[in-house]
Amino acid sequence: MTETLVAFDDVLASYDPAMGLEVHVELNTASKMFCGCPTEFGAEPNTQVCPTCLGLPGAMPVVNGKAVESAIRIGLALNCEIAEWCRFARKNYFYPDMPKNFQTSQYDEPICFEGYMDVDVDGETFRVEIERAHMEEDTGKSLHVGGATGRIHGADHSLVDYNRAGIPLIEIVTKPIVGAGAKAPEVARAYVAQLRDLIIALGVSDARMDQGSIRADVNLSLSPKDSGTLGTRTETKNVNSLRSVERAVRYEMSRHAGVLDAGRPILQETRHWHEDTGVTTSGREKSDAEDYRYFPEPDLVPVAPTRAWVEELRGTLPENPTQKRARLQAEWGFSDLEMRDTVGAGALLIVEETIAAGASPQAARKWWLGEMARRANEAGVEVGELGVTPVDVARVQVLVDEGKLNDKLARQVFDGLLAGEGSPDEIVAARGLAIVSDEGALSAAVDSAIAANPDVADKIRDGKVAAAGALIGAVMKEMRGQADAARVRELILEKLA
């Protein structure tokens, strides 16, 4: 059925949105949550498995202590309370990627609860309250062969890779986020971006959205404006980029309003996000907790972190996001607007790494929020997924600072980086992009431009130095952009003085 979408402004005139975000973070432990199998990404299918993570009879699980430590550190960084005693539970359901027919998770006794994170959107601070952060194991990965979409519907057959089954996860669940109004999509994106940066700073995960090591489920509902109630929610599963988080919230708000305006009820269901078309489609009816028949995991002992251990881990935390933003803004000399734009674009960490690699703060910001953001938008990916690294961008800027490139030539170097042609220096050499430093060649090009534009030359002789721009353009064209515009201007004014 074709969905009826309501214009975003019209949605806000009639409804209040409420969001809930569930973010799954794969921890970078060396072994899985309940067994000793390795967790290396990209291994051959079904080569990192054992009787425990395959759910074979008689195999007994053992809790990964490093995963518990990482969970506590995440909880502390999110201002959560840490449970003095918690235990695992079996979440029972059947699906091919869950070989045990249950997932070992936590239910009513999570390890972390009652936290918050403050996020900034356009100068306005929103407090996102954390309901819980609990430990669980990841599922396997299904591959549906055949069909137009790669989904199970219409597939010829399906394959399952159990390498991912049992990898430690932390699921971070927010309370309903209300009051964001028109900024709801941006708040959702900002929260996931800031959470991702925090996870990376903690060193507990690489938080690669493109590889699925951090994934977001977006819950959304609409209620009549100013009613103070919560509507029926839908859950959009496995949204795998910051851009998609924002787009999914915006789309679901428009879709919900279309359904409600038509007098139909919202179905409580899970939905699939399609990055290529920017729409969601129905998945399955959303289950409630009782449908999973949770009960305590009998094969695992409870987890009881001591207060001394928790306080020891608290001492390992990096500075919180608010403190870090204030410090970096002061160090970099960014205005409030420049800092908000950097944070809002999810580029704070990548700009920081580029500066650390040798670029100036303004140059790092210029490239990532300008050129790289434009290319990422055209490709439909995040800037961090382009394949250009902070070290690459810093090196390009160093070449600009040394007078070996200008901005136009630098963009051609980025073309080469995206095409996989090597390092910036290798691309400059292979493409012959370096700025011409031969004074004789520059002087000859200036003489040629003056001879070809006598009227412009006369204006400059009469003191109208602004006219030099036309001659500079002519020289740059002749030199194919491989000249220092400032030096060309100097030569023109010297010759016409």
Curated annotation (Swiss-Prot):
It comes from the Bacteria. It catalyses: L-glutamyl-tRNA(Gln) + L-glutamine + ATP + H2O = L-glutaminyl-tRNA(Gln) + L-glutamate + ADP + phosphate + H(+); L-aspartyl-tRNA(Asn) + L-glutamine + ATP + H2O = L-asparaginyl-tRNA(Asn) + L-glutamate + ADP + phosphate + 2 H(+). Disulfide bonds: none annotated. Keywords: ATP-binding, Ligase, Nucleotide-binding, Protein biosynthesis. GO terms for molecular function: asparaginyl-tRNA synthase (glutamine-hydrolyzing) activity; ATP binding; glutaminyl-tRNA synthase (glutamine-hydrolyzing) activity. Transmembrane segments: none annotated. InterPro entries: Asn/Gln-tRNA_amidoTrfase_suB/E, Asn/Gln-tRNA_Trfase_suB/E_cat, Asn/Gln_amidotransferase, Asn/Gln_tRNA_amidoTrase-B-like, GatB, GatB_Yqey_C_2, Gln-tRNA_amidoTrfase_suB_CS, Gln_synth/guanido_kin_cat_dom. Its EC number is 6.3.5.-. The keyword ATP-binding applies. Heterotrimer of A, B and C subunits. Belongs to the GatB/GatE family. GatB subfamily. Allows the formation of correctly charged Asn-tRNA(Asn) or Gln-tRNA(Gln) through the transamidation of misacylated Asp-tRNA(Asn) or Glu-tRNA(Gln) in organisms which lack either or both of asparaginyl-tRNA or glutaminyl-tRNA synthetases. The reaction takes place in the presence of glutamine and ATP through an activated phospho-Asp-tRNA(Asn) or phospho-Glu-tRNA(Gln). NCBIfam families: gatB, PRK05477.1-2, PRK05477.1-3, PRK05477.1-4. This is Aspartyl/glutamyl-tRNA(Asn/Gln) amidotransferase subunit B.
